[in-house]
Amino acid sequence: MNKADILQKLHELNWPAEDYWVVAGGAMVLYGLRSETHDLDLGCTTARADILEAAGVPFHPMEDGSGRCFTLGEDVEVFENWLVDRVEPVEGVPVISLQGLREMKRALGREKDRRDIALIDAFLQRGGV
């Protein structure tokens, strides 16, 4: 999923910007740190999560028990209140801040997350956002 694909998915969702934010690989793509991601992960407010549950969208508890994780189709997951730091607009799209994204990746601790942290750090050292 490239930047255009992500923007199209978000357009199709048609959610108010205050209800959600892009995290994980999608945020990496929107910041220009990667050209594509396998899927789109979003954070959302409890109010949006309640709307999704009422609409019958499949969900399960998040691993840490802090909220719900919804599955929209084959390539979009929505995590209730999954946010570190703050949300900032990137080309008009609500996206987790780079510092928040870095911390989120550090907490996940997978090899691909360590590679992403290196990309974020290099970008910040070059004076990015």
For each predicted feature, which ranges?
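Compositionally biased terminal segments of proteins
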Residues: M1-V129
